[in-house]
Amino acid sequence: MFQKILIANRGEIAVRIIRACRELGITSVAVYSTADKDALHTQLADEAICIGKAAPADSYLNMERILSAAIASKAEAIHPGFGFLSENAKFAQMCEQCHIVFIGPSAEVIRRMGNKQEARNTMINAKVPVVPGTKEAVYTADYGLKLAEQIGFPVMIKAASGGGGKGMRISHSREDFTENFEVAQTESVNGFADDTMYIEKYIEDPRHIEFQILADKYGNVISLGERDCSIQRRHQKMVEESPSAALDDKLRAQMGEVAVRAAKAANYESAGTIEFLLDKNKKFYFMEMNTRIQVEHPVTEMVTGLDLIKEQIFIAAGEKLQWKQKDIHITGHAIECRLNAENPAKNFMPCPGKIDYLHLPGGNGVRIDSAIYTGYTIPPNYDSMIAKIIVYGKDRQTAIDKMRSALGEVNIDGITTNLDYQYDIITHPVFQSGNITTSFIENYFE
């Protein structure tokens, strides 16, 4: 087992990893930017090293500085969290070259699964159902239009290297195709330095269902059930829950088996997520694989009793999975709401600033993952998510009631958040019915 782990991240996920290290008796090393000198993760870690200025390029995205900090602190492994360098194949490779363990899959797997077209082809070869679409890269709108007409409108235009909802546009007809293609491609170039696009059939009003998997270095892979992430705004998840109201035991088992097959086809190790679209006829299609821990991993932890961060550490240290598929039982229901420092009334504009007063909820079955405190100033340089409120109940309605109560207890002064917006989602009759799709926000809130 590792003696010392460096956490190449910030915010609530850095705090989450530090806590797991502490429970395992592993020394934790935080890295931080000048904007984060008072951040909670720097205070909780055993050691903290400043790696640069506030801009992510000068700190949390600066591979050389992070690796220098790891070498200087004699850390044996780096946990990348999510975002930043977590799905950067070059960084994983650099860790390997420096004889530091990257807590995640290999650089080659990150590269292959990060390229959406290669990931699709890998799944097609493994007989995993995929959304009908192009098999080759598309670089021009003219060529893309020809392929779109063959597939049939509406289509989804996607960046091959995309993620987080960037580089994606829906085209409903040949008339709007060129404009949407060019916008998506520009986003891809700006966000990922890659102009490679691909086109697939747009599945209307699907559910977004993802399966959590764990895989060790010895070919053992298990599924930890699904998360329903259908409540999204512009492809950004807002509310996540497990299990999904849409799946019965038979479909859950079938999708879980396909998720395991997909992970094996990718030669995957560590915690990972296979994302599917589920259409109105209960047909499911592979969408992408996330080669990192997810923001929404706590809902899976609540219904399985596993600690996914610890499992990642065990796997990276070369240990065999201590669980078999028959050991995994989904009990009860968990829901997560993301609390963001943003103003829904002003097109969700980020609202950084000082927290003058903070009270977060508690009680039986309520978990808070956050890095904020009274007096803390949220810097303007990073993602607007400041906390995750997670609840657990014996069934979905109990969990909804608990979330309604928890959100009602939150008191945060000094900054604007999406708290009321999340409350409105949770109490909406359509959400309560469980009959939700990825169009929920668009249909009822915009």
Indicate where each model-derived feature is located:
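ATP-dependent carboxylate activation and anion-phosphoryl transfer catalytic cores
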Residues: I7-R16, A20-E23, A48, I71-S73, ...
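A polyampholytic, Gly/Pro-enriched intrinsically disordered region
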Residues: T122-V131, G152-P154
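ATP-binding N-terminal substructure of ATP-dependent carboxylate-amine bond-forming enzymes
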Residues: M1-N125, V138-K146
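Structural signal for short hydrophobic segments within the conserved structured cores
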Residues: E47-I49, R111, P129-A137, M168-R169, ...
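N-terminal nucleotide-binding beta1-loop-alpha1 segment
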Residues: A159
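Methionine-biased hydrophobic packing positions in alpha-helices, especially
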Residues: I110-M113, M123, M156, M168, ...
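Structural detector of well-ordered beta-strand residues that form the stable sheet scaffold
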Residues: V29, H79, V101-I103, V131, ...
